[in-house]
Amino acid sequence: WEEIGGFDERFVPAYCEDSDLAFEVRKHGCKVMYQPKSVVVHFEGVSNGTDTTSGQKAYQVTNQKKFLEKWQQELQENHLPNAVDPFRARERSVHKKILLMVDHYVPHYDKDAGSRTVYQYLQLFVNQGFSVKFIGDNFFAHQPYTDALQQMGVEVLYGPYYAKHWKDWLKENGKDIGYVFLNRPHISVKYIDAVREFTNARVIYYGHDLHFLREKREYELTGDAALLQSSADWEKKELELILAADMAYYPSYVEEQAIHEIAPQAKVKAIPAYLFSDVEECEYHFDKRKDLMFIGGFGHRPNVDAVKWLANEIMPALVKKLPDIRVYILGSNPPEEVKQLATENLLIKGFVTDEELQEYYQNCRISIVPLRYGAGIKGKVIEAMRFGTPVMTTSVGAEGIKGAESILDIADEAADFVEQLAALYQNEAELVR
């Protein structure tokens, strides 16, 4: 305020001084923030009347001319005439790259790992100066998640109108969209043809994991022939999407290698699944920690199977070795078949907030990941490492992490898992290393 000299006195006694202040603030390298949820009550004419030809109100016309004269170059270079191309004009997007992100719904960043990934990439694109639009395939304004995106600066398309007319919106604005980021095969397949038809955008496909690989592994575990057919169907769909996109990304080198084995020509690269900018060094105090934890959203079948295997094959033997042990099962939407597994030693807690989850990471001695099948890098493993909590996992849980053998304890058979976990739980030197 002092650096720019407050309000410009050329706008005395009133009108345009606030707009001028915003332009001056930007000129000096700062940002002007707009809060769309604020409410302004304005009684037109109460202060200075409504006649722009006399009295104080006349300064409204006079000062608009002064404002235009002062900022003529800025307005010509970075703004558009009134009512011309509002899609580009709003958010001062004349020179911004516009990116459309598509997923199944607005990211529930505190409920599942995939949503956390999408949310963090949205943050990245906004911070990089993109004008970001978001379509959730269910077109529902889940809260508080929709508000969180809007406060970030993301335009979210939701409601019955967009559910019915999203193709019209894409056709009308597609010429300005430079990038389209499609998530998950079952969602991307609905949108990629329209994106190609109505835009010239570079299309990025992010698969999260390989569905065909996950279902093939589940078939190998269960022998369910329907899963083998489903795996073949997914492989066809996923390869079509990968080859149709300009670039496909996955969260680890495992998916990259698997795709290149069956489609060497595919443009596929591994990128980080998570973007943590606030990683703090964590102190591990053995005596202040106890018990075990498992975190996973239960809309994901491998997590349900993991808890069932834990309860039926691991817990009985583990409790014999560690009678006072408690295992906290955390994660959204646990089904009845999981809730019914609860015992004195196995506590089904369900959904926890990010703050509560961090407390579990900081208070539990070990985070366990007893996954028997799945595909892709596991967010629960990366998250535990972020908080400095030791991890006991299967090889499925360790997949995609280079050097996993040196930083994780890994066992695949129930008996081996119990032996290693019980020994690790009591080994202070190993846990604090």
Model-derived features with residue positions:
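Conserved donor-nucleotide binding/catalytic region of nucleotide-linked donor-dependent transferases
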Residues: 423-433
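Acidic donor-binding loop of glycosyltransferase active sites
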Residues: 176-178, 246, 362-376, 387-389
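A short, conserved alpha-helix in the catalytic core of glycosyltransferases
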Residues: 2-5, 10-41
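Short hydrophobic beta-strand element within catalytic cores of glycosyltransferases
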Residues: 380-384, 390-394
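Conserved catalytic-core segment of nucleotide-activated headgroup transferases in glycan assembly
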Residues: 110, 114-119, 123, 134, ...
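C-terminal, non-catalytic tails of nucleotide-sugar-dependent glycosyltransferases
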Residues: 27, 31-32, 49-98
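Acceptor-binding helix/loop patch of EC 2.4 sugar-transfer enzymes
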Residues: 108, 201, 205-232, 257, ...
